[in-house]
Amino acid sequence: MLHNIDLNKMNQLMKENKDAKQIISQLLENHHTAVSTIAHEIRNPLTLVSSALQVMEIQHPEVKDFSHWSQMHEDVDFMCSLLNELSSFNNSDSLHYSVFSIGQLLKNIAVSFAISLDEHDNHIEFSSDIAPDLHNFTGDKIKLEEVLLNILKNAQEAIPTDTLHGSIHMKAEQITDMLIIKITDNGCGISADHLESIFEPFTTYKQNGTGLGLSLSKRIIEAHGGTISVNSVPGKETLFTLRLPM
């Protein structure tokens, strides 16, 4: 898997040398093709395994009493999630541009996320402050929504279930030609050691995490010409800041 620092070096080399640009472009194309092929080849038998488990449950309900049955389901679900995120990561810098109301998108995300909290985590209060004068945005609407929902979901998971007053806040404003989105939570926080590598692929500090969510988010934001950063005080709060050129 190519890391962000590798991509930065390659982009610089491609600008300086036309021959290198052609060679690197071909290597990147082969890299994307290889990852897609591997994911596809693994997904097919994994789908068969998942289907077989479902059939076994229907025909032999007693298998649910097997001590490791639920773990088998969790392992298959984890592999499916990993393949989905791997495919998304592989295509994260391929954007489908359109012009849309970023303000309306943020409002829709806020409503959807608030509803999901009401259903599952009523100990968490969610609030949003979206500036009413945001300009239209040109970018990949679906992938930006994916980034924001991923960060909001991480914030949700960072707040322990025994917290009496969990809080998540999303703020969006436009300063000159820059869109700034901040997402804050009062969850467990992230240690300084973990902050250094949190955007690296396959880096995760939570159970059943794939380690691709934040790395994928970073690649999508950077593909839009923006930046994403994080600040955290362990045991107090975490702040993710997204900056996107309008």
Where are these regions (language model features)?
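Conserved HAMP-HisKA connector
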Residues: 15-39, 50
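Conserved DHp (HisKA) dimerization/phosphotransfer helix of two-component histidine kinases, i.e.
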Residues: 66-116
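Conserved catalytic submotifs in the C-terminal HATPase_c
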Residues: 109, 123-135
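Short beta-strand/loop element within the Bergerat-fold HATPase_c
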Residues: 165-177
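Short conserved segment of the HATPase_c
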Residues: 190-201
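Short alpha-helical Gxxx[C/S/T] motif in the catalytic ATP-binding
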Residues: 213, 217
